[in-house]
Design a protein with these regions (language model features):
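Bacterial N-terminal signal peptides that target proteins for export
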Residues: 1-9
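Bacterial N-terminal signal peptides
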Residues: 8-18
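C-terminal subdomain of the subtilisin-like protease fold in secreted/lumenal serine endopeptidases
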Residues: 21, 33-35, 39, 44, ...
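Protease zymogen maturation seam
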Residues: 24-88, 94-102, 140, 384-394, ...
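Subtilisin-like serine protease catalytic core
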Residues: 35-42, 75-200, 228-229, 272-276, ...
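Loop/turn elements at helix/coil->beta-strand transitions in domains of secreted/extracellular proteins
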Residues: 85-88, 179-183, 213-219, 244, ...
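Extracellular S/T/G-rich loop segment that most often corresponds to the catalytic His/Ser-adjacent loop
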Residues: 93, 267-341
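Catalytic-core regions built around general acid/base machinery
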Residues: 228-254, 268
Length: 410
């Protein structure tokens, strides 16, 4: 079997294809947030609204350009008090622009290496100077986009911002995990045509083992692949099914993308039957599952926003709009991390968090998607949100009662 894995990331078919082609070459990144403040080019999908929320000065959110934040109840996770122990989210992607204004204060930091000596493996984990993660493509600590990725918009930068974009920093956007998530950047795929740019099982296994060893509690996979190996299966089983090998280790959850490119089966890692797999099913702001969405195995499957999503870019404007199942995965990852970092759930291990928060509360929400047209989801799926766990409301659009969705900002 070919040892390379086809790493696939799709666009949502409900919107013009041109809106998916935002990855244009650029030389610099604007931090003004000007692009994020403008009306969205897909505003026909998302009615414009000004958010009266004093908890953030991010213009993208306040101007109504981040419909998905309140859609998942993300603003309920924001607090005036610092989170004592943010949840580490391992992002498996093409890297991330660590200097971006939305990310530079929202990255996981390996303190031993950050405060150690350059060129020395200060923490003895086998990786030198791995301050914010590791580049498994070029096997070095620089996790920013490399090679042919430089100057492009960067898929990983966009995903990282949907997980944990910094709130209230006077820039463009905020994320559900702004307070409670920190992103560990694991560069596992490149942008060019070189053999080493392709995702392969050995690299994924190394990255999974690294993330588990370094304390990641949410593993975010916005891509999918159709083939696997016994070794890769075993690595995912260690992370998402087996008890933690280390006493006191809370364990980890894998958030997997359910693609919307017309394939019959969801592919890996969504296809794994492991008990700590949570799947993101792409939906629009109308509660409709994206056409072409693959069938997901039974389990913890949640509808998560995919269309007309504003996020950070490594390109000139600093921000861009994207549509697709990747967005659903990153948004769900940030939401889960933000919940897990908040009281009283921060003390839970992975299995207890899944049982008491995700399965017993989130999956019992009264908000569900509509059934899909192909019949793969005849009862729809529960919509991902924090409202069943909410103790307060931040704006009129958050946590509406059943039957009020038509008045909700979308």
């Amino acid at each position: 079997m070919d040892r390379a894995i086809r790493f696939s990331i799709g666009c949502l078919a409900l919107v013009p294809a041109a809106l998916c082609a935002q990855s244009t070459p650029a030389q610099s990144t604007s931090e003004s947030g000007e692009f994020a403040c403008r009306p969205l080019s897909c505003s026909t999908l998302v009615p414009s609204r000004t958010v009266d929320d004093k908890s953030t000065n991010d213009c993208g959110y306040r101007n109504g350009n981040e419909w998905w934040v309140d859609y998942v109840g993300g603003s309920l996770l924001w607090s005036d008090k610092p989170v004592s122990k943010p949840v580490i989210v391992a992002l498996f992607d093409d890297g991330a622009l660590t200097s971006h204004v939305e990310l530079r204060n929202r990255l996981w930091t390996n303190e031993a290496e950050a405060n150690g000596k350059p060129g020395i493996d200060d923490d003895g984990n086998g990786y030198i100077d791995d301050i914010h993660g590791w580049d498994f493509v070029d096997d070095d600590p620089d996790v920013s986009p490399q090679g042919e990725c430089v100057g492009r918009a960067s898929h990983g930068t966009f995903m990282a911002s949907l997980i944990a974009a910094e709130r209230n920093n006077g820039a463009g956007i905020a994320a559900a995990g702004s307070d409670g998530a920190r992103v560990m950047v694991l560069r596992v795929v490149g942008c060019g045509g070189r053999a080493k740019d392709q995702l392969n099982p050995e690299r994924l296994i190394r990255a999974l083992d690294y993330a588990q060893k370094m304390g990641a509690r949410v593993m975010s996979f916005s891509a999918h692949w159709s083939t696997t190996t016994p070794e890769l299966d075993a690595a995912f089983a260690r992370v998402a099914d087996a008890p933690s090998p280390n006493p006191g280790d809370p364990g980890a959850i894998v958030v997997a993308s359910v693609p919307n490119k017309g394939e019959a089966a969801a592919g890996y890692p969504a296809a794994y039957p492991f008990r700590r797999i949570v799947r993101a099913v792409p939906i629009g702001n109308d509660n409709i599952i994206s056409p072409g969405t693959s069938a997901a195995p039974p389990g913890l499957n949640f509808g998560s926003p995919s269309a007309c999503v504003l996020g950070a870019s490594a390109g000139t404007l600093g921000y861009r709009i994207e549509h697709g199942s990747s967005n659903s995965t990153a948004i769900l990852s940030g939401l889960l991390a933000g919940l897990w970092a908040s009281a009283p759930y921060a003390r839970f291990g992975a299995d207890e968090f899944l049982a008491k928060v995700v399965r017993d509360r989130m999956s019992r929400t009264t908000r569900r998607s509509q059934p899909d047209l192909r019949g793969d989801y005849p009862k729809g799926v529960p919509l991902a949100d924090a409202c069943t766990l909410a103790t307060k409301r931040r704006s009129a659009s958050v946590c509406l009662e059943p039957g009020q969705e038509q008045g909700r900002s979308q």
